[in-house]
């Protein structure tokens, strides 16, 4: 019998308890949906939470936003690569875009996940509810915001997320933790 879902192991770095709580709740919810076959319309992606407030200057490119987690994905016991996509709300509600459109995470990558973001906003904006003279030339991603998502290489199968307590539970890799162009030009 072939597997019916991908397994995504998530390790939260730096003992960030609030971030770990968010992932724990999400994992339990997604696991329940898959185990109980609650819905045939299971989401393709697993949202990632921004671990800190991040300000991204207007008209700036390739701003690295660390996600505070490390992951590995398997399908049928074999390690699998996976994708990092923007959530639809990023395009609809923010001036942000992924610099490389889609992040491809190799099966052997075990480093911290991150997103390279461009801020296409050219206008200085007044912050809502702030003094009329307060003008900002950046966009703020707030701690806990969901801006990107992990998707499996085959969107037909859902992702079963598991929160792990030890980085070693992600599995061994020759590749290691170098990312963003580290394997060559």
Place the predicted regions along the sequence by residue.
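DUTPase catalytic domain/fold
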Residues: 1-185
